[in-house]
C-alpha cells in the first residue's frame, strides 16, 4: 500500500494530530484520508492534495466531479477564506459519495462513509438530531466560516442530505448555535 512521509513541508497548524507527529513518519493514503475526514487534519489534507498533483490538478478533479463553484486556491489552513464552495455543491458531493456508482468505486465510497461516521466533532448538525439518528458527515471551521455537511439516517429509515454553512464573527458561538438550531428544525420536518 502506498505511503507518504510527513515532512516539515506538510506540517501545518490548525486541526488534526499530524502536526504533533514525528517528522518522516509514514502514513498510508487511507490513513491520511481517515485523518482528513475524522479530525479535519490540515496536514493530511495538504499531503493528499499533493498526491493528486498541483492546485490546477486538484481543481480539475473538482470540475470533473461536476462542481463548478468549488475551488481550492491555497493550502490549509485557509483562514483568509480564499478556498470556496457552496452548500449545493457540498450536497451534490455527498450524494455522489453515497449513491453514485460512477463517482467512485464501491470500496472507496464505503471507506469514505465509514470515516464520515467517525468524525470527532459532533457538536454541530449532529447535536440537533433526534435520538438514534445516524450521521455521516464532515465539518469545517476557518474561524469566520463554520460548516457541517452530511447524510442523516433517521431511526424510521428516512435519509436526507443536509449542509449548513454559517458566516460569523471570528469564532463566535452564535455560528454553532445557528447550525444546531437549524439542524433540529430540519430534522423535525424531515422525519415527520
Residue ranges and their predicted role:
Residues 1-11, 55-59, 105-108:
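Short, well-structured active-site flanking segments
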Residues 33, 45-100:
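Mid-domain, small-residue-enriched loop/turn segments at the edges of structured enzyme/sensor domains
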Residues 28-32, 39-44, 73-78, 131, ...:
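Flexible glycine/proline-enriched surface loops and loop-helix/loop-strand junctions
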Residues 12-47, 55:
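Conserved catalytic neighborhood of penicillin-recognizing serine enzymes
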Residues 51, 98-123, 132, 139-192:
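Structured C-terminal helix/loop/strand segments within mature extracytoplasmic catalytic/sensor domains
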Residues 9, 37-40, 51-52, 67, ...:
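Active-site-proximal beta-strand/loop segments in catalytic clefts of secreted hydrolases
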Residues 8-21, 114-125:
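Short, mixed-charge aromatic SLiMs
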Amino acid at each position: 500500500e502506498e505511503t507518504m512521509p510527513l515532512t516539515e513541508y506538510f506540517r501545518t497548524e490548525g486541526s488534526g494530530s499530524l502536526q504533533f507527529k514525528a517528522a518522516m513518519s509514514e502514513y498510508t493514503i487511507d490513513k491520511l484520508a481517515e485523518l482528513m475526514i475524522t479530525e479535519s487534519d490540515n496536514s493530511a489534507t495538504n499531503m493528499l492534495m499533493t498526491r493528486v498533483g498541483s492546485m490546477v490538478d486538484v481543481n480539475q478533479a473538482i470540475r470533473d466531479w461536476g462542481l463548478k463553484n468549488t475551488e481550492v486556491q491555497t493550502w490549509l489552513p485557509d483562514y483568509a477564506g480564499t478556498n470556496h464552495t457552496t452548500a449545493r455543491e457540498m450536497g451534490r458531493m455527498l450524494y455522489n459519495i453515497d449513491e453514485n456508482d460512477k463517482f467512485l468505486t464501491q470500496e472507496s465510497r464505503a471507506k469514505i462513509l465509514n470515516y464520515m461516521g467517525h468524525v470527532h466533532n459532533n457538536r454541530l448538525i449532529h447535536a440537533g438530531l433526534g435520538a438514534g439518528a445516524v450521521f455521516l458527515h464532515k465539518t469545517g471551521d476557518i474561524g469566520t466560516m463554520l460548516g457541517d455537511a452530511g447524510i442523516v439516517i433517521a431511526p424510521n429509515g428516512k435519509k436526507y442530505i443536509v449542509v449548513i454553512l454559517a458566516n460569523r464573527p471570528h469564532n463566535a458561538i452564535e455560528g454553532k448555535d445557528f447550525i444546531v438550531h437549524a439542524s433540529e428544525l430540519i430534522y423535525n420536518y424531515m422525519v415527520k
